[in-house]
Amino acid sequence: MSAAAHRTPKSGRQSLLFQDLASPVSARRGKFSSPGQAAAVSALWRENFGGSDLPPPPMYTLDDRSDFSPESGIADYSASPDAKSDRRTPFQSSGKNIVTPGKGKLEASPSFSLLNAQQSQQVSGSPSWWSQSKAGSSTEQDDKGKGSPVEGVVQPGALVTLPPPREVARPEVQRQIIPTGNLDEEEWVTVYGFSPGDTNLVLREFEKCGMVLKHVPGPRNANWMHILYQNRSDAHKALNKAGMMINGVVIVGVKPVDPIQKQALNERLNNQGFMPLPPPSSTRNTARPLSRPQYLQNGSAFSPQPSGGAMASPSKSMVSKFFDLMFGV
């Protein structure tokens, strides 16, 4: 019976289902473009694998596929004890036999055994540093477990630690301090750093600090002298003049008298005595012919010496008369 007998007068063409089943497979959709190629492939398959059963399709579960996930380092919550006990990287886990219900069937498959052998060779042939780094990373992940996500990223040894701030060296002015005590007691100070010709100039400057009871010059051509003030407050004022410039030409230093020198000066003051500052009087002319006394010159007290070079004569006033009687000018 011809195909025209099956057609009805209402429909002049075949149904869509019949057309789909009757249409040949195109070369783009099919695996083989011609029946000859399909026959050759089937003959080759029967020749190689004709004596064995066809391998079953691979069976995978969600637990098995988790090993291939790029997030295999993250702890999963599967109920399978085998999957939790063996946590490896995707590269290593792919080289081992996959644990599935159809394990025996998979091992019997020659294609899967060949694939496992190739992958094991790739893993064994990898460089030693790669395997060591993999092993180190896996052990670190096992040790850390579920720690902080930043662990291993920030290393404490790589942090730059700043040194402690150093104290700024500031020069401090060394101030001469007199031992504390009664401020009304007498106090010795030593003035130094001037030439013998500037003795009067220095002495007049330090008389501005307070009442000077006595002064003791040093040996011949010495650049220092001892000054005794009436109280300690005046001696403190004299110590503050250390490093001061007098008349723009002389810079002097001041320091307290050493305890040993202070004791020797007090003993000489009590035993022999020094010439006190005489009060001003009208008998200055009668006192001038007398030899000028020298105080403790080279250890000898009151050694008379003739007056040397000319001294600068101050103005004729009460202060000048006072200094004339004091120094014998």
Curated annotation (Swiss-Prot):
Example GO molecular function? structural constituent of nuclear pore
Question: Which keywords has UniProt assigned to this entry?
Answer: mRNA transport, Nuclear pore complex, Nucleus, Protein transport, Translocation, Transport
Q: In its UniProt record, which GO terms are filed under biological process?
A: mRNA transport; protein transport
Pfam families, alphabetized: RRM_Nup35 (PF05172)
Per UniProt, subcellular location reads as:
Nucleus, Nuclear pore complex
Question: Which SUPFAM superfamilies does this chain map to?
Answer: RNA-binding domain, RBD (SSF54928)
Domain named RRM Nup35-type is located at 183-264
Q: Where is the composition biased (Polar residues)?
A: 123-139, 282-306
In terms of PANTHER family, this protein maps to: NUCLEOPORIN NUP35
Question: Family per UniProt?
Answer: Belongs to the Nup35 family.
Specify the protein name. Nuclear pore complex protein NUP35
Which lineage?
Answer: Eukaryota, Viridiplantae, Streptophyta, Embryophyta, Tracheophyta
